[in-house]
Amino acid sequence: MSFTPGKQSSSRASSGNRSGNGILKWADQSDQSRNVQTRGRRAQPKQTATSQQPSGGNVVPYYSWFSGITQFQKGKEFEFAEGQGVPIAPGVPATEAKGYWYRHNRRSFKTRDGNQRQLLPRWYFYYLGTGPHAKDQYGTDIDGVFWVASNQADVNTPADILDRDPSSDEAIPTRFPPGTVLPQGYYIEGSGRSAPNSRSTSRASSRASSAGSRSRANSGNRTPTSGVTPDMADQIVSLVLAKLGKDATKPQQVTKQTAKEIRQKILNKPRQKRSPNKQCTVQQCFGKRGPNQNFGGGEMLKLGTSDPQFPILAELAPTAGAFFFGSRLELAKVQNLSGNLDEPQKDVYELRYNGAIRFDSTLSGFETIMKVLNENLNAYQQQDGMMNMSPKPQRQRGQKNGQGENDNISVAAPKSRVQQNKSRELTAEDISLLKKMDEPYTEDTSEI
């Protein structure tokens, strides 16, 4: 049983060139067809698959089922990782996802200064056993051929795929499975990245792609068939950097004025929308640590969300839905302590919440999370203990080491015998005093 790519989704198309009958045609893969009038434009001669290009470049003798991949940066290799690189085609099972990418060397064009510039190549995909290298075995070292296959495909047998008839089958926009890494410096035809910037540019590009057109405007209208020139990437980078007024090679420096502006911008936000960082610390955003705000210690108080350990904690943070629907909420009106007395007072409310975040040891990074939590929960208690310790006496200016230390030492008075708790025998005087204390008190009535 032979498979036809896109059989069940032939209506899918991209932004490539279309003829009047709805068949998708690419710049280097146009078939013999009648001239079609389009919106006031004169009919353009169509290039066939077997016609020779007078300005260089090889023709594509076979029609690919997919749109091409065009190179726009010089020196970039066309390659895919193992098991990747086969385009998605509805109706084709994974066992038939095998083939190769064929490099098409495109034509050259004349620049305004009269020099010839060669367009960068474009690659087309063909299933194994089809296309210009239908008779070659998978993996054969051929210049301009890159072999690709899925992990489920048997590369020892050709793919059971029919050849594409351009008169009845549309070319499928190239798409890849999720996780596919595209070659750097290439873009997919029809993806919109190479769309011309204006109608005049589109017309000039259409005229340049017609090999049989003899009547052209001046040479200034000659542009590449693709809207992307080889040096366009460098031009885009230069324009972006010029727009930003920055140099990408230089790291951005944060001055005191910049840090102050960043801090003020953060503090102007509502309390629940602030994100502390190096320029605006945790205490500046939310106040000192205590029983009600008991998280944070050490470097995390200084760096805030910039701390390298914070992202793993952010994975525990609840979503907005979990916050509202998974917590106990209470609305309370509080006293407004801000503003002057002569200003109109505003009603201030607090939305108080109580909830919990549950996780177990199967959570990714569990050990690291527990370590960070243990280091930062109630860390203020340890810091307060260190602050309550007697600080080291500071030496005043003009004093040498050791000088003045004895002046700060308070000399206690010697203890009495009672404080010393020493035992002694009673004397005769002591016994006499004790007897007088036992006698009854008599008031002296004698007159003077």
Curated annotation (Swiss-Prot):
Bias (Polar residues) ranges: 29-38, 45-55, 399-409
Q: Name one GO molecular function term.
A: RNA binding
Compositional bias (Basic and acidic residues): 422-439
UniProt PTM: ADP-ribosylated. The ADP-ribosylation is retained in the virion during infection.
Of the GO CC terms on this record, one is: viral nucleocapsid
Pinpoint the CoV N NTD domain residues: 61-190
Which subcellular locations apply to this protein? Virion; Host endoplasmic reticulum-Golgi intermediate compartment; Host Golgi apparatus
Q: What does this protein do?
A: Packages the positive strand viral genome RNA into a helical ribonucleocapsid (RNP) and plays a fundamental role during virion assembly through its interactions with the viral genome and membrane protein M. Plays an important role in enhancing the efficiency of subgenomic viral RNA transcription as well as viral replication.
This protein is called Nucleoprotein
| Native organism | Bovine coronavirus (strain F15)
Its organism's taxonomic lineage begins at:
Viruses, Riboviria, Orthornavirae, Pisuviricota, Pisoniviricetes
Q: Which gene encodes it?
A: N
